């Protein structure tokens, strides 16, 4: 049975235009309070971003839902996530697709996320400590790629790891950021601007 807080969040998401019932069911199946510090658990179902340590955040549920919806996921999809973070977005993806590959440059976050996903019996996820700018080429190509931190421009290395017809959703920009959807058509790519967003930067090269 869903808590009142979860029901209120789902109502808010619907009011903000999230209509995919399969996605909403996945969100309702993931206890967000398990992905934040115990001291912030009372805020877990507020539609807001929360700190998770290491200067990183767990994105607000609307952005998680919006980006996931834009990926147009099918149950047999193989997806790459850049920026595992708390593992919350990863868990929602795991309820929606066949397999999730997730890269995180901060070892402490990767370890915590891996433990949480295991506790929730989500075993269709592979995580890796690595540079998100490089993706995970040995496991590609991917039907979808989601990037949960903002590069100043769209990384070509990630675009090349999309299947033909694959979709990548990511925030782009340094000071002000725009959410973009990029679709691959053969050797060409079509980019579409979605909305203004705010994310932590996608740090290149340096692992932590």
Curated annotation (Swiss-Prot):
Secretion signal, residue range per the UniProt entry: none
SUPFAM superfamilies: S-adenosyl-L-methionine-dependent methyltransferases (SSF53335)
Gene Ontology CC annotation, any one: cytoplasm
InterPro entries: PCMT (IPR000682), SAM-dependent_MTases_sf (IPR029063)
Keyword Phosphoprotein (UniProt): no
Localisation per UniProt entry: Cytoplasm
Catalytic activity: [protein]-L-isoaspartate + S-adenosyl-L-methionine = [protein]-L-isoaspartate alpha-methyl ester + S-adenosyl-L-homocysteine
Active site: 59
Enzyme class per UniProt: transferase
GO MF: protein-L-isoaspartate (D-aspartate) O-methyltransferase activity
PROSITE patterns associated with the record: PCMT
Family recorded in the similarity comment: Belongs to the methyltransferase superfamily. L-isoaspartyl/D-aspartyl protein methyltransferase family.
Name assigned to this protein: Protein-L-isoaspartate O-methyltransferase
Organism: Photorhabdus laumondii subsp. laumondii (strain DSM 15139 / CIP 105565 / TT01) (Photorhabdus luminescens subsp. laumondii)
């Amino acid at each position: 049975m869903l808590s009142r807080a979860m029901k209120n969040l789902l109502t808010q998401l619907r009011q903000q235009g999230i209509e995919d019932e399969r996605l909403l069911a996945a969100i309702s199946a993931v206890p967000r309070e398990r992905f934040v510090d115990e001291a912030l658990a009372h805020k877990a179902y507020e539609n807001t971003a929360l700190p998770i340590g290491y200067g990183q955040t767990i994105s607000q549920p609307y952005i998680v839902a919006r980006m996931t919806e834009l990926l147009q996921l099918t149950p047999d999809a193989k997806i790459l996530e850049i920026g595992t973070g708390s593992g919350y977005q990863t868990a929602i993806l795991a309820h929606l697709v066949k397999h999730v590959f997730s890269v995180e440059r901060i070892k402490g976050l990767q370890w915590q996320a891996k433990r949480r996903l295991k506790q929730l019996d989500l075993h269709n996820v592979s995580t890796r400590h690595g540079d998100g700018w490089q993706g995970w080429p040995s496991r590609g190509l991917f039907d979808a790629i989601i990037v949960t931190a903002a590069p100043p421009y769209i990384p070509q290395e990630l675009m090349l790891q999309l299947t033909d017809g694959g979709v990548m959703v990511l925030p782009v920009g340094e000071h002000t950021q725009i959410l973009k959807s990029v679709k691959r058509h053969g050797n060409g790519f079509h980019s579409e601007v979605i909305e203004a967003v705010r994310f932590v930067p996608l740090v290149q090269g340096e692992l932590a």
